[in-house]
Amino acid sequence: MDLKQYITIVPDFPKPGILFKDITTLMDNGEAYKYATDQIVEYAREKQIDIVVGPEARGFIIGCPVAYALGVGFAPVRKEGKLPREVVRVEYGLEYGTDVLTMHKDAIKPGQRVLITDDLLATGGTMRATIDLVEQLGGVVAGLAFLIELTELGGRKKLEGYDILTLMQF
């Protein structure tokens, strides 16, 4: 299935000059959403995943159905102040400043094989920070899965050494 036909390109969003890749039109189509999810599930099975991790919010949209299909848990990664119990945290650089991501301290057990999911691989900053959280907890990052990769932004380079699945490239 050509998943690109289900992605809507929105010019000048969120700011002028950006061509936003809207995944909601893929999600609106049950057949396309199922196909995309099934592709990631197949990849995850090959990696013998114990748990799926995803950063808010679109990483949840991708990761939760994958975890369900695999019969494994899902651990959310959230911005600081959003998780109610003790967390590990990582600060990471943005284009203008820094941000912080957190994860419950007991979300990953040492040695667990982890699949990290997100909708989009752009610069790789959010994914790199998510990897750092998983590894702080002793998890083994067995794979990274994205719906879309924006190749011109070079995020894959920031993630060298990790196995990456992208379903579409723009």
Curated annotation (Swiss-Prot):
Pathway field of the UniProt record reads: Purine metabolism; AMP biosynthesis via salvage pathway; AMP from adenine: step 1/1
Q: Which InterPro entries match?
A: Ade_phspho_trans, PRibTrfase_dom, PRTase-like, UPRTase/APRTase
Query: Reaction(s) catalyzed by this protein?
Result: AMP + diphosphate = 5-phospho-alpha-D-ribose 1-diphosphate + adenine
Q: Which Pfam families match?
A: Pribosyltran
Task: Kindly report, in one word, the top-level EC class recorded for this enzyme.
Answer: transferase
Q: Could you cite one Gene Ontology molecular function of this protein?
A: AMP binding
Biological process (GO) annotations held by this record are: adenine salvage; AMP salvage; purine ribonucleoside salvage
Q: Which UniProt keywords apply?
A: Cytoplasm, Glycosyltransferase, Purine salvage, Transferase
Q: Which GO terms describe its cellular component?
A: cytoplasm
> Might you give the EC number(s) for this enzyme?
2.4.2.7
Similarity-based family? Belongs to the purine/pyrimidine phosphoribosyltransferase family.
Quaternary structure (record) = Homodimer.
**Protein purpose:** Catalyzes a salvage reaction resulting in the formation of AMP, that is energically less costly than de novo synthesis.
Identify this protein by name.
Answer: Adenine phosphoribosyltransferase
Taxonomic source organism = Geobacillus thermodenitrificans (strain NG80-2)
